[in-house]
């Protein structure tokens, strides 16, 4: 899965560009969001772009919801408060009813998520007639989001920081593998509905994570996306070459492959040196939080 085109490192692209102009870059490409500081202030800006054509072809409206939610989640994962988005809507020939249907439903999903998350669209553009030999591209709405950090020194990155930290998963895991990378790459199937986004849980979980980051209670944070829990943890280990040992919960209704590679939404992997107060806070707010394991070990 780590070698698939959707998940593999894109470093060969971004390393060719100067992403350290004026040395304001606090978090370089490869993480959940890029973070840059604002001169003369303590503020920072976080930026993220996201798209999921495979979700949008399976369910255009739910795909529209998901890409907005993931952009919101990526900004949250570095400690930023999401402010607004711009959209770039790429589709095939709108004279075909099915293509226009995809377009309309994606917009409905984007509107639904933006309204619930208070994440307004401030600009955007539309590109139609993207096709070759009468075959259109997958519905490809792209969302670019921006967020603000009141104090850039409190931003957080996704990589494990040191051995001995407790790894936790925040959010509800149901083992949804429909339209997942696992299904495509391992089972060689492209089918099933994409995971449904619970926007109430999305907002609650994200607001909680942001408060943990603001309070300095966690050492790393990464949203769970393509490839599920296993890929998310693997990416966190690769950042600083610090390993991890994890134990899956004993849930008879969720197969191990679905627990590891399912792409349920509204989830994060976080690490901390002191899990007890975080577990207590999560319990008080009825936010699902499970201790997954510990960092440590050579890569």
Language-model segments: what does each one mean?
Residues 209:
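Phosphate-interacting basic helix/loop segments used at nucleotide- and nucleic-acid interfaces
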Residues 59-62, 101, 193-203, 219-220, ...:
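A short glycine-/small-residue-rich loop at the edge of a beta-strand within enzyme catalytic domains
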Residues 1, 106-109, 113, 117, ...:
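Glycine-/charge-enriched secondary-structure boundary and capping motifs
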Residues 2-175, 180-191:
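Glycine-rich phosphate/pyrophosphate-binding loop regions near the starts of catalytic domains
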Residues 152, 163, 180, 202-204, ...:
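In a subset of proteins, long, contiguous C-terminal domains/tails are tracked
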Residues 26-28, 63-66, 147-150, 196-206, ...:
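A general structural motif
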């Amino acid at each position: 899965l780590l070698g698939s085109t959707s998940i593999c490192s894109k470093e060969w692209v971004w390393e060719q560009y100067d992403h350290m102009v004026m040395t304001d870059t606090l978090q370089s490409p490869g993480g959940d969001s890029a973070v840059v500081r604002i001169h003369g202030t303590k503020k920072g800006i976080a930026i993220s772009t996201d798209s999921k054509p495979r979700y949008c072809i399976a369910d255009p409206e739910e795909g529209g919801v998901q890409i907005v939610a993931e952009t919101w989640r990526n900004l949250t994962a570095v400690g930023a408060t999401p402010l607004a988005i711009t959209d770039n809507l790429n589709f095939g020939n709108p004279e075909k009813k099915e293509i226009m249907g995809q377009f309309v439903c994606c917009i409905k999903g984007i509107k639904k998520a933006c309204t619930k998350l208070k994440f307004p669209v401030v600009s955007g553009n539309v590109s139609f007639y993207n096709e070759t030999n009468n075959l259109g591209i997958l519905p490809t709405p792209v969302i670019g989001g921006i967020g603000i950090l009141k104090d850039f020194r409190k931003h957080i990155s996704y990589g494990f920081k040191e051995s001995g930290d407790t790894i936790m998963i925040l959010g509800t895991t149901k083992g949804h593998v429909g339209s997942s990378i696992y299904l495509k790459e391992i089972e060689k199937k492209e089918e099933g509905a994409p995971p449904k986004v619970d926007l109430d849980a999305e907002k609650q979980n994200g607001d909680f994570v942001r408060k943990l980051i603001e309070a300095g209670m966690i050492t790393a944070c990464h949203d769970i996306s393509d490839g599920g829990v296993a890929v998310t943890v693997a990416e966190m280990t690769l950042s600083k070459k610090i390993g991890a040992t994890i134990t899956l919960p004993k849930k008879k209704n969720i197969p191990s492959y679905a627990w590891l590679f399912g792409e349920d939404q509204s989830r994060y992997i976080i690490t901390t040196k002191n899990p007890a107060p975080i577990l207590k806070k999560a319990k008080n707010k009825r936010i699902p939080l499970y201790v997954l394991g510990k960092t440590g070990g050579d890569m």
